[in-house]
Amino acid sequence: MKHAFLLAALFGVAAVQANPTIETNGVLSNRDGRTLYTFDKDSTGKSNCSGGCAAAWPAFTVGNASLAGGDFSIVVRDDGTQQWAIQGKPLYFFAGDARPGDINGDNQGGVWHALRSAPKKAARNDSASSSAGYSYSY
């Protein structure tokens, strides 16, 4: 990853960190506070939301020189755009969310879910862990 940052610096491109989200009240959003959603009908690494679906549920697209890492990956949509994914699940916004922090799309049609973080349960282990201590539910 060090080399990617060096290349970005050489070419005058700002690299985006591997975690493109923030957490507010247990819900993950982009850095502008727009809630992120997953779609039950997506396959791992593949978006199945296009056309009218994509108008109501815009993809959380990847900016220039973005670097995936950890639970975050990048999937390529059928139209060629790149979309953020978490644990292989593509991420979306809901067009019906008017303000940062809105979660109006949660459980829409029983197949759209706001991305929530939940503390992992502690496991009995004598060794130290380097985990961030969060899992995601969708």
Predicted regions and their residues:
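Intrinsically disordered, low-complexity segments enriched in polar/charged small residues
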Residues: 7-8, 121
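Compact beta-sheet-dominated domain cores in extracellular/mature segments
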Residues: 17-138
